[in-house]
A protein has these predicted regions:
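N-terminal alpha-helical targeting/anchoring segments
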Residues: 30-90
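Negatively charged, low-complexity tracts enriched in Asp/Glu with abundant Ser/Thr
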Residues: 4, 16-17
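Acidic low-complexity segments
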Residues: 5-11, 21-33, 80-169
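Residues in well-ordered beta-strands of folded domains
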Residues: 25, 55-57, 149, 179
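Internal metal/ion-chelating core segments
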Residues: 165-179
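A generic structural signal for short, solvent-exposed coil/turn residues
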Residues: 16, 46-48, 140-142, 170
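Structural beta-strand/beta-sheet cores of well-ordered domains, especially the beta-sheet scaffolds
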Residues: 20-22, 50-54, 146, 172-176
Length: 179
């Protein structure tokens, strides 16, 4: 089952199973990691990432029980089984007196700049040259040996709720660890 289709299905199924407040978040993207040791690149990895996270409550206002988990969304049967177990588990958790339910009023959020840099998506093989530059600079500053990792990723996050929120955003990250 495709990620967004699974997300829509999960929300619908949880409503039918009696869940009250539901947030289903889908993340999909691609991650890259370059490792280096003794001034040499020793490993290059990349992988696709995708996951489906759920937060939900059951019960009545003032007596809500909450839980959250990540689920596998490979097929409808697997999803149904996991959702049934999640509802059963949540009904047996203590009442969460701190949770008052999801807000029902409509919010307008300002755009948050800087969480997505399209240059990260196009790094590709140039990530090796970034590593080489970092290693060379460390050597110029007196380091005899260097090691570390360069990790970067990008993707999309979509949030779907029982209060009719359906929003998504793109994200990117980059991190260099050098020692």
């Amino acid at each position: 089952m495709k990620l967004n289709s699974a997300q829509d299905y999960v929300l619908k199924q949880l409503k039918s199973l009696g869940a009250k407040d539901i947030v289903v978040t889908a993340h999909s993207g691609e991650s890259f990691q370059n490792k280096f040791a003794n001034n040499e690149v020793v490993a290059n990895k990349n992988w696709d990432t995708s996951n489906l996270s759920i937060f939900l409550s059951v019960g009545e206002n003032g007596n809500l029980r909450t839980s959250g988990t990540d689920i596998s969304y490979s097929d409808q049967t697997a999803i149904d089984s996991q959702l049934n177990r999640l509802i059963k588990f949540t009904k047996n958790t203590p009442i969460n007196k701190n949770f008052l339910g999801l807000p029902v009023e409509t919010f307008k959020y300002r755009e948050v700049r800087g969480i997505y840099d399209p240059e990260i998506k196009s790094l590709g093989k140039s990530s090796i040259s970034i590593l080489r530059d970092a290693i060379d600079l460390a050597n110029q500053k007196g380091a005899e040996r260097t090691g570390g990792t360069l990790t970067h990723n990008y993707g999309t996050t979509r949030m779907l709720t029982s209060t009719d929120i359906d929003k998504s955003y793109d994200y990117s990250n980059i991190s260099l660890s050098l020692r």
